[in-house]
A protein has these predicted regions:
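Carboxylate-rich, polar loop motifs that coordinate divalent cations or form catalytic acidic clusters
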Residues: 1-249
Length: 249
C-alpha cells in the first residue's frame, strides 16, 4: 500500500495574478505554470508571478482582444489562440508573446481553439476550420461540415477526430488535406450541447460531458452508449480527463 501526500497553494490577485477570471492553465517544460486570464498571460515560477502583454507588429495590445485558449506543445512551447483569429507564440529567447498569425477575415469568430498531436492549431468557426501548423507555419482552410458552432475537439489517433457542437458530436477523419464525417451508430443520434470530450485509447471509449445532461461514454468497439448511474442533474460538465496513467480499466 502506497500513499502520496499533496500540497495545495491558493494563488489570487493579492499574489500578483492579473485577474480572477482564468480561462486556461498549462505547465511548460521548465515546470512553470501559465495562466490565461482576462488581462493576458501570467506565469508562475513557484515564487513570483510575471504578467505578459501580447505583441502585434511590435505594438503592445490592450487586454480587450478576446483571448480564448492556451496550449503547451510537445516541446514545451506555449501558444495562445484568440477568439478573433489571432495566434500568439511565446518566444523564450526574448521572454515575450508575439502574434504569428492573424485571420485575414475580420469577421472570423472562433468558437473553439485546439492543438492536435500533428502540430496543427485548429481555429474553428461556424463556416470554416482554419489549421495553422506550428512547425511549417502553413495555413489550411477547411469547410465546417457540421455547419454549427464547434464546442470541443478531441483527437483519437493520427487522422481521426471527434468534433462536438451545440447539437451533438461527430466522428471525422482528416486525411489528404480533407475532412470527412464518418457515421457511427448511436452516437450520431445524440442531440445535446457537448462541453467536453475525452478519448481513452486503451478502452477505445469516448467520454462525453454535456451542458445539462450529465455524462456518458460511447464504446467504439460495441457501438453502444454507456450512461452513468450517478445523476448529476443540471450540472454543466466542462472538463473530463483520466486520473490514471496507462490505465487499462
Amino acid at each position: 500500500l502506497m500513499a502520496y501526500g499533496q500540497t495545495y497553494k491558493h494563488i489570487g490577485v493579492e499574489d500578483g495574478l492579473s485577474n480572477r477570471r482564468i480561462y486556461n492553465i498549462q505547465k511548460d517544460h521548465q515546470g512553470y505554470m501559465w495562466f490565461l486570464t482576462n488581462e493576458g498571460m501570467d506565469r508562475y515560477n513557484g515564487k513570483d508571478i510575471k504578467h505578459y502583454k501580447l505583441i502585434e507588429e511590435n505594438k503592445q495590445l490592450s487586454s480587450e482582444i478576446h483571448l480564448g485558449w492556451l496550449y503547451a506543445d510537445k516541446e514545451g512551447g506555449i501558444w495562445v489562440i484568440g477568439k478573433k483569429g489571432r495566434i500568439f507564440q511565446y518566444e523564450e529567447k526574448y521572454d515575450r508573446f508575439t502574434m504569428v498569425y492573424k485571420s485575414p477575415k475580420v469577421t472570423d469568430a472562433i468558437s473553439y481553439g485546439y492543438l492536435d498531436r500533428n502540430n496543427n492549431l485548429w481555429l474553428c468557426g461556424k463556416d470554416s476550420i482554419l489549421l495553422y501548423n506550428t512547425k511549417t507555419t502553413q495555413v489550411m482552410r477547411l469547410p465546417n461540415l457540421l455547419e454549427d458552432n464547434i464546442t470541443v475537439v478531441e483527437q483519437a489517433d493520427d487522422t481521426h477526430f471527434f468534433i462536438a457542437t451545440e447539437m451533438g458530436v461527430r466522428y471525422t477523419q482528416f486525411e489528404n488535406e480533407a475532412l470527412k464525417v464518418i457515421p457511427l451508430d448511436m452516437l450520431d443520434h445524440v442531440y445535446t450541447q457537448i462541453n467536453s470530450l475525452y478519448f481513452h485509447p486503451q478502452l477505445h471509449r469516448l467520454f462525453v460531458g454535456t451542458f445539462s445532461d450529465g455524462t456518458f461514454a460511447y464504446d467504439m468497439s460495441a457501438h453502444q452508449i454507456i450512461k452513468s448511474d450517478t445523476k448529476l442533474g443540471d450540472v454543466s460538465i466542462t472538463h473530463i480527463n483520466s486520473s490514471l496513467k496507462n490505465s487499462q480499466a
